[in-house]
Amino acid sequence: MRLTARILASGAAATLLLAGCSPETTGTATPAPSGPPSASASANPAVPKVAAPLDVSKYVSKPCDIVPSSVLSSLRFTNPGHTQLQDEELGAAGPGCGWKISGEGVSMQVIIGTGNRDRGAGGLTGLYGAHESGQFPFLEPAPDVDGYPAIYVDKRDRRPIGNCVMDVGVADDVAINVYAGGYEGAEDSCAAAQKVAASIITTLKGA
């Protein structure tokens, strides 16, 4: 399976960038913001800053490696991930990787939002700007991930139906979008997304 256009026209959670697509697809992430955030968004005091930026460059060419296989296995994703490298269409938000559990409709996707950064719409600032412009009507702070700020962001809040879209700021201009879809509800989908997000921070700290 290849990451869908909906994911990445992502127009990536958040990112990647990243968010909101339909629950009928095997997966979706936050679509990329359509343009640079406005000056008011850039200065928005609600946008959390990243105190200790992390370097994602090592994983831009191999985004599937950013999530440890042990973490994926613990979530029952045993099939290889499917890579979508950045391009002008499907990968506009940045490079990503998708996994699925065969026969269950459960999926996990990650997008590294370097494409959003390069367009001047990167990081949580870009997502807050997209929220303010109405592109992503739903945005809510999420628990920090190992000290890194995070948000839930989507076209609408789909957590109750088992689709959790979150973005974690790893630098002020780069966010990583994590999408967990096809779960029973908000608790299990967001727990899975948070577990993957935490493993990504651990990976980046050790890179």
Residue ranges of model-derived segments:
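C-terminal motif of bacterial Sec signal peptides marking the signal peptidase cleavage site
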Residues: 17-20
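A small/polar (G/S/T-enriched), proline-flanked helix-loop surface module common
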Residues: 25-31, 35-207
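Bacterial N-terminal signal peptides that target proteins for export
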Residues: 1-11
